[in-house]
Amino acid sequence: MNNKIKVGIFPLTGCEGCCVAILDLPNKLLELNEKIEIVNFRLFEEDEHSPDEKYDIVFVEGSPLTTRDIKQLKLVRKNSKYVISIGSCAHMGGIYHLKMYQDKNKIHDYVYQGEKGIENLDVKPLSAYVKVDFSIPGCPITGEEFYDFVYQLLIGKEPAITQNPVCYECQVRGQKCVLQYGEVCMGPITQGGCD
């Protein structure tokens, strides 16, 4: 009998940088493999599984930029205990969201030069379409964050992402503050946890 947690990793429109980041920790992935069964991960296997299948945990990367993406996202939500957005694209719309600060139709026409049949939906985070249980921010996420997140879920703990700024992490590590040397640093306003 297979008691492993069934996990799916579904990419929407995006660069798949977060999916690649998951592969950064091969030994930890092997360790997780004892407890989870990754049944949908395009970077592991050629055949994609259907979003109609039942999943315990689904990680979604990328932005829902097409009606196909939105349909898949809704199916995944319907068939999953947990839906977790990974990366800035899924969490906030990512780089694609920049088009929302201009005339999106003008940008569309410039990029696609009058090409017909290309959708031009508003860019929204996953949470605009479905309930998202947790988010792992970053562009891309780190493999370590992914591993920690899955591990916390496996032991029944509610996953948490650090809320401390990078400045806090530098102080804990005993590093000197570059601001004291007159150097520019975004540490005070940058969320920590990115190693």
Describe the role of every protein-language-model region:
Residues 1-182, 186-188:
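Iron-sulfur-associated redox domains of electron-transfer enzymes in respiratory
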